[in-house]
Swiss-Prot record:
Binds 2 manganese ions per subunit. Its EC number is 3.5.3.8. Catalyzes the conversion of N-formimidoyl-L-glutamate to L-glutamate and formamide. Pathway: Amino-acid degradation; L-histidine degradation into L-glutamate; L-glutamate from N-formimidoyl-L-glutamate (hydrolase route): step 1/1. It catalyses: N-formimidoyl-L-glutamate + H2O = formamide + L-glutamate. It comes from the Bacteria. Keywords: Histidine metabolism, Hydrolase, Manganese, Metal-binding. The gene is hutG. GO terms for biological process: L-histidine catabolic process to glutamate and formamide; L-histidine catabolic process to glutamate and formate; putrescine biosynthetic process from arginine, via agmatine. Belongs to the arginase family. NCBIfam families: hutG. PROSITE patterns: ARGINASE_2. SUPFAM superfamilies: Arginase/deacetylase. This is Formimidoylglutamase.
Amino acid sequence: MTQWYPASPALWQGRDDSIEAPDARRLFQTVTRSETFSPENWQQKIALMGFACDEGVKRNAGRPGAAGAPDALRKALANMASHQGHERLVDLGNWVAPTPDLEGAQQALRDAVSRCLRAGMRTLVLGGGHETAFGHGAGVLDVFAQESVGIINLDAHLDLRQTDRATSGTPFRQLAQLCDAQSRAFHYACFGVSRAANTQALWRETQWRNVTVVEDLDCHDALAQMTQFIDKVDKIYLTIDLDVLPVWEMPAVSAPAALGVPLIQVLRLIEPVCRSGKLQAADLVEFNPRFDEDGAAARVAARLGWQIAHWWR
């Protein structure tokens, strides 16, 4: 059974420069840590939550270890400088899946996300494998049932696989099927896709589903496509699979990318999403601390989370 735990205060530690000036502060000094899961107490804030689950990665024959990512990323975030927007972060703890019940874990996340959004919060989730996306995205779809929701995925993989059970490779097929069941349009864009990592069958699925696809080779010039997608929806859920980054920037994932999209290009692509006023939910997934020897990859991932919170409007 999936369980909730508050984040350990030991994770939020860092260098104290406050003697220099009142605004010489770091995230460990400005992030609020909640001892209870009580989003109703934090309206207009950003709910920082961990989804400590990699059962979907295991089912997808990947390299397990992403269940340890939420706390590793908190540690990497803690000592980063606090700027405008970061004071809105409230750490609402981790959803921990200690058993192979992935479906139950996804439902728990779905319910938690729905509760946060209905309380007037926005959600920043630290996965976990990309199975995080079904629980997170379903929660967004549940709350904004009468509005068009755009799903923006930065990922080397389309994650539209067809299997007999949920995995880290199926979340967007699951979300598409949920949209079908709710009689609503499925608005999905995937940036950074590696043609070498996705079968022809998956490419056919994108055509049938009318998915916006931008390959890794073309992301240097994709702002217009991103803007067009933003303009056509009411609300946005942004999910970043860290394997979209090249292996030299992000080796600590289940499936490192030989080519990938450099961090600077990823940041330029997500800035208009964050500033659009439409972003309701975002996550970082697939980070695997087992393959991060010196903490450098955690800092790369943390910079993405830091930037999202700073730009979020």
